[in-house]
Amino acid sequence: MSEIWEDAIKSNAWPFVEAKKILDSLNGKIPEKGYVLFETGYGPSGLPHIGTFGENARMVMVQKAFEQLSDIPTKLICFSDDMDGLRKVPSNIPNPEMVAQYMDMPLTSIPDTFGECESYGHYMNAKLRSFLDKFGFEYEFYSSTNCYKAGMFDEMLIMVLEKYDEIMELMLPTFREERKATYSPCMPICPKTGKVLQVPIEKWDAKAGTVTYKDEAGNYIEVPVTGGHCKLQWKPDFGMRWAALKVDYEMYGKDHLANARLYSEICRILGGKPPVQLCYELFLDENGEKISKSKGNSISVDDWLKCAPVESMALFMYQNPTRAKRLFFDVIPKNVDKYITFNQKYHLEEDRAKRFANPVYHIHHGNVPQIETFGITYSLLLNLTSVCNPSDKSVLWGFISKYEPKATPNTSPYLDHLAEFAIRYYNDFIKAHKSYLSPSEKHKVILQDILDMLSDIADQTEAEAIQKAIYDIGMKAGYENLRDYFKDLYQILLGQNEGPRLGTFIKLYGVQEMKKLVEGQL
């Protein structure tokens, strides 16, 4: 354990950094409850998106890193805020006008617009659990509705009434004058309508365990805060949950950062110890806007997994969690190829600290599979797909087998999967956007030079030699920036702005096939 500890800390990999923070907060001792509790949260107002997966994937990376550093048992819970009142109707669900009739109702009290589960909230929870299960996450699922109604939070809710003034003193300075007049940490569930009410509380009684408010007719209504008859506002709810469940580690998006101090103070007021926390940056869409469950303006988990292996998605989640990243379809090929590179480096590396620093160690929780692609990248397969437009992967294997006779679907099942993924990605995201550049007279001279070069080279010419020859043709053509030269070639030959190292691509595609491609543009 001491050797692992030393190398883990030396690696400076962020899951180990976080794990050490947790261990330090415990002074290396087992908590009274007997385990360290990791918590992730889910707001089921809309369909789970890739950010939801990301939070859970990162959390498990920290949990597994902690287990490497300590023998203290751990538990992960995924908490769904499914008792929240509906504030906004998502745009990416069926029958939104039906859902709009249930504004302010708890999500588990709204009919399922998909027609599959007992409520809208239950459907969203099922969607979350199904894809968490698919990735083998080991977790316990907690429903806010169930926790409130089963009395799990009753003791804390009574304490909220006992500490009511102290909580209000903390919360009120964070609001505008208008909101201060109506705010209460407690939101009664209306006995008549079932709605979550944001109303001023006229009276609270810690001994009786009740709050009193005025209804629309001016009548005083007294309700218990226990047994699911009241819910806390989301900020006090966050801190209360930490205290009630004795959470040791939580991560949340940057949109929570401004309120993190409030969560921690509420937790302390209620007698708890705030957990170690990590604030991660949010994902942005291609326009730089925050991705949203209700907008559905993001790549879905299904989109990614249709076109690439799950470990490429996990790699995207691992990298720089505290830095904002754009999440759009172009990131998929880049992360597949990054994963291949990291995987190969991991198995060549003998230094354990450097292995611990490699993302694939954390993606696979220490059990890193060995893959073989014979130097063929996902991007190269995409470009091959782009020029031959195959109906199935056997067409790609025809080129792969000529390039590397040792490569077969059996000797490289990973490469076989990538070939299938490449065809799907091409059909979904490249094919419709291809736009060819008509060659100018200058371009035709360049293409003829490339054709002459290809006619002169021997079959065994290495990719680097071909690449240099193409580079020299660009230099001779007088381009100030060779990036423009290669961009022109990609647009003329592939119908896209970016492309592969042409030397490697020609070796894979074949010299004779490349000559036909060039001739077709002359």
From Swiss-Prot:
It is an enzyme of class 6 (ligase). A motif ('HIGH' region) lies at residues 44-52. It is found in: Cytoplasm. One of its GO terms (biological process) is lysyl-tRNA aminoacylation. InterPro entries: aa-tRNA-synth_I_codon-bd_sub2 (IPR020751), aa-tRNA-synth_I_CS (IPR001412), aa_tRNA-synth_I_cd-bd_sf (IPR008925), Lys-tRNA-ligase (IPR002904), Rossmann-like_a/b/a_fold (IPR014729). ATP binds at residue 293. Belongs to the class-I aminoacyl-tRNA synthetase family. This is Lysine--tRNA ligase. The lineage of its organism: Bacteria, Pseudomonadati, Pseudomonadota, Alphaproteobacteria, Rickettsiales.
